[in-house]
Amino acid sequence: MPRYPHELSGGQRQRVSIARTLIMKPKFVVCDEPTSMLDVSIRISIMDLMLNLAKDLEVSYLYITHDLAVARYMCNRIAVMFNGKIVEIAETEELLSNPVHPYTKRLISSIPVPDPSYDRKVYDVNFDELDSLIEKYGSDKPMIDIGNEHYIATHDVTVSYTHLTLPTSCCV
């Protein structure tokens, strides 16, 4: 039964968009919040579809999201941005369990936890102090590897980040 685009549900529209994108057999796709407007009940099926297609078609995604739970599910590495600049990159579980940059710590602390009795680490970050560092040193900070391919932005302008490459599946 043929339908017009306005007659499709959000999930159907997203599947059509995915099909239109992948019909060209790309090796790399930028996905900017592809599931944010979907109902929670449909979101997981779209993410599973994307992961299965990535594996079957050998395509890599740069998945842009504000939702760290989605990033954890979709990506093997996460790059955190502050004021439009990448401040930390690491394997997903490494970054979520051992954040180093003050903004990453604050971002992780802001994730709501459904169980109020769950005791989690809360990071206290002074955003005025963080903003003053950005103003003082600029926002183009070099990245350094602190081990396990965990990169953080630094204010030491003598460090080069030309060796830094993004992995095949990364969330920003």
Sequence positions of predicted segments:
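Charged, flexible cofactor/metal-binding loops and thiol motifs
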Residues: 91-159
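Conserved ABC ATPase signature
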Residues: 4-8, 12
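A short, surface-exposed alpha-helical micro-motif characterized by mixed small hydrophobic
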Residues: 71-73
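Conserved small/polar residues in nucleotide/adenosyl-binding loops
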Residues: 162-168
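Hydrophobic anchor residue at the start of the ABC signature
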Residues: 18, 46
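A short, proline-enriched helix->beta-strand linker immediately N-terminal to the Walker B motif
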Residues: 23-27
